[in-house]
Amino acid sequence: MAPMHEEDCKLEASAVSDSGSFAASRARREKKSKKGRQEALERLKKAKAGEKYKYEVEDLTSVYEEVDEEQYSKLVQARQDDDWIVDDDGIGYVEDGREIFDDDLEDDALDTCGKGSDGKAHRKDRKDVKKPSVTKPNNIKAMFIASAGKKTTDKAVDLSKDDLLGDILQDLNTETAQITPPPVLIPKKKRSTGALLNPFSVHTPKAIPSGKPASPVLRNEPLLTPIPLKRAELAGELAQPECPEDEQELGVMEFEDGDFDESMDTEKVDEKPVTAKTWDQETEPVERVEHEADPERGTTSYLENFLPDVSCWDIDQDDESIPQEVQVDSSNLPLVKGADDEQVFQFYWLDAYEDPYNQPGVVFLFGKVWIESVKTHVSCCVMVKNIERTLYFLPREMKFDLNTGKETAIPVTMKDVYEEFDSKISAKYKIMKFKSKIVEKNYAFEIPDVPEKSEYLEVRYSAEVPQLPQNLKGETFSHVFGTNTSSLELFLMNRKIKGPCWLEVKNPQLLNQPISWCKFEVMALKPDLVNVIKDVSPPPLVVMSFSMKTMQNVQNHQHEIIAMAALVHHSFALDKAPPEPPFQTHFCVVSKPKDCIFPCDFKEVISKKNMKVEIAATERTLIGFFLAKVHKIDPDILVGHNICSFELEVLLQRINECKVPYWSKIGRLRRSNMPKLGSRSGFGERNATCGRMICDVEISAKELIHCKSYHLSELVQQILKTERIVIPTENIRNMYSESSYLLYLLEHIWKDARFILQIMCELNVLPLALQITNIAGNIMSRTLMGGRSERNEFLLLHAFYENNYIVPDKQIFRKPQQKLGDEDEEIDGDTNKYKKGRKKATYAGGLVLDPKVGFYDKFILLLDFNSLYPSIIQEFNICFTTVQRVTSEVQKATEDEEQEQIPELPDPNLEMGILPREIRKLVERRKQVKQLMKQQDLNPDLVLQYDIRQKALKLTANSMYGCLGFSYSRFYAKPLAALVTYKGREILMHTKDMVQKMNLEVIYGDTDSIMINTNSTNLEEVFKLGNKVKSEVNKLYKLLEIDIDAVFKSLLLLKKKKYAALVVEPTSDGNYITKQELKGLDIVRRDWCDLAKDTGNFVIGQILSDQSRDTIVENIQKRLIEIGENVLNGSVPVSQFEINKALTKDPQDYPDRKSLPHVHVALWINSQGGRKVKAGDTVSYVICQDGSNLTATQRAYAPEQLQKLDNLAIDTQYYLAQQIHPVVARICEPIDGIDAVLIALWLGLDSTQFRVHQYHKDEENDALLGGPAQLTDEEKYKDCEKFKCLCPSCGTENIYDNVFEGSGLDMEPSLYRCSNVDCKVSPLTFMVQLSNKLIMDIRRCIKKYYDGWLICEEPTCCSRLRRLPLHFSRNGPLCPVCMKAVLRPEYSDKSLYTQLCFYRYIFDADCALEKLTEHEKDKLKKQFFPLRVLQDYRKVKNIAEQFLSWSGYSEVNLSKLFANYAGKS
């Protein structure tokens, strides 16, 4: 029986009966009779009257209920589970479930167990413990009690600070005392997070051995460093042996408040995580919970369909693979002997971080250090201090008078430069201390008037002094280089550190205060103390893959985190094959929305299944638990999907919103102020995790593979070849109705984390990123973010530093360029930015030969130059250091930019330049690695390592050319890029001429490849011919090589960059097989629905087959009729109708959002919560009939909406007419017997709407919905000739295609400034010249129209003539040459009208302003559009409008149209 005390107190029976529990009456422990309100008042009345009150002792029946131990434990448990304070979520008030007499039991236990303290101390402790933190009841009883005398109240406690303890309580670094089976005696006092008191733990109490202390989990090796006692010792107790993690979780709330009185700074003992035996290999497979449908619940039938067949929790786990806990003494550095026998600190650096504003001149290096005593690696942080700014002053030849702006005749010496810096510059910029010396440096970049080799004054001073202006000039010096070079760059370059590697720190210093969350912290007082250790393999890393589920709060529309799951591998090797399985431990934590409750049996279900699930009462508790686990596990790499642009941002925002302490545990650097979140580059989110690298598999997949979208479901299907079920966001709330549903939700999150980890392993993301980083010499965390431009930049930086060159300073671009400074990938994502950049870098690209369109059924040879542009750079020694660029004066004198000045090729006798040398190194190293791969009996791990290395070398070498032509690159050199492409065009034309001289027909060529029609059906002869051409071409070059890329058995060549072919693949037995290859066709683009793609694939397969023409036409006809019927009767799955289109910018940044279907749907998705789509993401949508008369573009819906809304149905006519018909019609153009009318008839469409004609829309217009009337302005005028006008001041050609440049806050009028950054003259100052140029362009277009050239629609004919033929067909004049097809105008009336509309559009400022938001409109009007500027715009617009008024194209004369009908009436 449980012990029951006979207290000398009187309890009212009614109080017991009302509450059903003694707990209801124990808020105040007053020894007063409570037999009834009336009797109490009567006694009070008598007492006031002066009557003597006699105490009567009555024989009372026992008010205690006698129960056995098991019943009492259940009662205590039930009270703990009860949320007895409404909406309190257990924070601040905690019900521990015990009776009022349990405190006395605990007092006795404390008296008997306490050691080293006298009784007084215990009594004092007991007094503190017995103060329950409860609120005063608002009733008459409270008034009576208050009247008896003033009670001493508890000191007010700041709950936000108390919640800080909740985070620490979750930190599993702290050992707990041994606990025994129930009854659980817990001190009754205020808790920080009462939610964790609920025993929704993964294990049941019977799993804990009763009465026996748990064996400590330690490695077999003895610990050489003494283990300091834990914080529990401060409370006067001996540290207990370590408990397994399972037991720690059960006892997670068993700490005293005193355990946390010690400062965090003194916590120097950390351990590696011990994984609980969540998957017990000795346990039989857990039986799944069966789910029965409840017809009364609307969502049950839907949820039932997604219940898992196999539970992911039933996986066995090998205990031997799980790392054991280790303890380290951070004050005792693991030093080893260096090369010169001195004690050094050796570590493998992984990530680096600098804070130039708060800690200038300091670089933090994060990595792993080997602990010999326990044979493992743990995290460390090395703080490198005193990295000085390094500037180079270029002296003038003659002194310069800054006042007059003229050069004097006084020669300049280096002493003069020094004195000017010492007396003027240092005083002005408060540089109190500096060092200087004379050095000789080389320069080879784009600033004119800088000599190739010269003496410079090198000046070094503390980085704590602000940097000097980038454009600083003086009387004795003309340029200053290195003003804005970062401390991190200086450190990496000067110490020759190329990517993650082993480093040694001489004379390492301990830090007084902890600066990081790492196990060891070291300080290097100067960068020279850090040196590279070569040729040592990397250590294994701790990798954590996590996934989380969010819900949108319906009130504030913020994303709230409800569950998280993580998988961890504690020894993930970077130089071997991925481990199998790719994780060793896992954990899962779940909370609930504020308006939901957990299922009543949820705790029992997870206990029964023996799962490791932590239940958190609030989101704050959940996040605190996650941060504590991250701190405990200490991962080196966090892996996720869409983690950079959504999950990490949401996590940090919720940390901020919930005021969770120690937010910086998400990274490794201790910080108090969270960086600014929400920037488009994700800069703040990346900085928050410094020290822990972020691997976003979405970013990695975009670089390594091609998919129609990069959503997790698509990646799982493409890479892992399995299906991922998606839980709609709106169904998550309903999953809290039953344990089985909630369990499935957690399993879904767990599986997502596993999918993410598997994708990372399948793509070899980490080993590849490491190899690329070691080649380029940048930072691995940036490589994982996909910055190709930055990789090239660092590779060249290392090369030029090593060769004593001054490198270009980083340019701070104004407006959109600032955003591109960190993220070069946006070149692909934002077309507007890309176009703006290219205005300053316009040069001719690769040559594309005109295709001889048609179907070829003889063998076609495809010859391809290997790595054309890198090979050209090597072949002709094209480099910054070898090519003499034309002077700026010559460039300004060039009026026609299209006839750009191509620099001369360098002298063949010149020494090889740095750029070709670096490319050659990469090529040669790749060849060596490929040779090593051919060795016999290689270890599979070594083969994989070699393969990853050669792939990294190839990726790096092929991207080297890009830095020359990318206008935001630090090494941007337009003349060099133009020279490379010029030589590429020249080589392709020369190769074409050579092949034609061999009496062979070249039918197509594109940049680095040509197609040759062999007119042969003998494969052996074809290869002989190919080898002959190959040898003839290769004779001309030393390094350039052309090779046979493919042989096509048949080829359907439609237009430039568009063809389909059957590729021949020889087999070992002398025969061959064929494989279909598609290039540029609609069916390989993602903005066509799968139904159209599948139909197009079938048609192509038929055309390329060996069947007769009649059979092909018949098969196509049958298939199209079948498809038309299936679409109309609704037997086609909805997924076949989904159209995918990529966002080129964030959805909210589009000015005309309604007319763009993917933008409209993206905004809806973002409003729903669960995920966030942004620039670069792909949006799926379907076109539906919704009962409205809106255009197709405005009837686009997300697939989820189609499933939910009953009034939506697939728009079958749209898909047949606008998706399937155009795709099939384009493919069948060269095929006799099939035309657009027949295709329409077969699909069940109205054939009168179609006529035989050539589709001349560009590939971008192909994907648009509903025709020209529904196009946006950008898409409507995409093919128009851009308006160009030379700047009278600088001669730069300005290109205008819109009223505004830039977007968002960076928007400004296109006429506001010249595209030449150095030109200060605005185009608004020469409006007369601009108007005259516009009139001349319009007249030229009109003349072109009236020239009246006609061309034949037949692709194989293409005749061009001006004389109108006499023979006409129903569709127009017949071509007199081929007599098959009709003639069409080369420059149609529609083209002329569209061009005139475009000229009006680019100067219609009033219309453009109306499309903006009110805020943007007011800002632009105030800043850029005074009345005078608006009038200038209107004048130019009126010119185009005047010419348009003369055109009759847009007008319909109704009187003429209905003249016949009017006469009849």
Curated annotation (Swiss-Prot):
Name of the protein described by the UniProt record: DNA polymerase alpha catalytic subunit
Question: Which reaction(s) does its UniProt entry say it catalyses?
Answer: DNA(n) + a 2'-deoxyribonucleoside 5'-triphosphate = DNA(n+1) + diphosphate
Q: Where is this region: DNA-binding?
A: 654-719, 1249-1380
State which gene encodes it: Pola1
**BP GO terms, sorted:** DNA replication; DNA replication initiation; DNA replication, synthesis of primer; DNA strand elongation involved in DNA replication; double-strand break repair via nonhomologous end joining; lagging strand elongation; leading strand elongation; mitotic DNA replication initiation
Instruction: State the function annotated in the UniProt record.
Output: Catalytic subunit of the DNA polymerase alpha complex (also known as the alpha DNA polymerase-primase complex) which plays an essential role in the initiation of DNA synthesis. During the S phase of the cell cycle, the DNA polymerase alpha complex (composed of a catalytic subunit POLA1, a regulatory subunit POLA2 and two primase subunits PRIM1 and PRIM2) is recruited to DNA at the replicative forks via direct interactions with MCM10 and WDHD1. The primase subunit of the polymerase alpha complex initiates DNA synthesis by oligomerising short RNA primers on both leading and lagging strands.
In alphabetical order, the GO MF annotations are: chromatin binding; DNA binding; DNA-directed DNA polymerase activity; nucleotide binding; zinc ion binding
A cellular component term from Gene Ontology for this protein is: cytosol
Residues the record lists as N6-succinyllysine modifications = 974
**Lineage of this protein's species?**
Eukaryota, Metazoa, Chordata, Craniata, Vertebrata
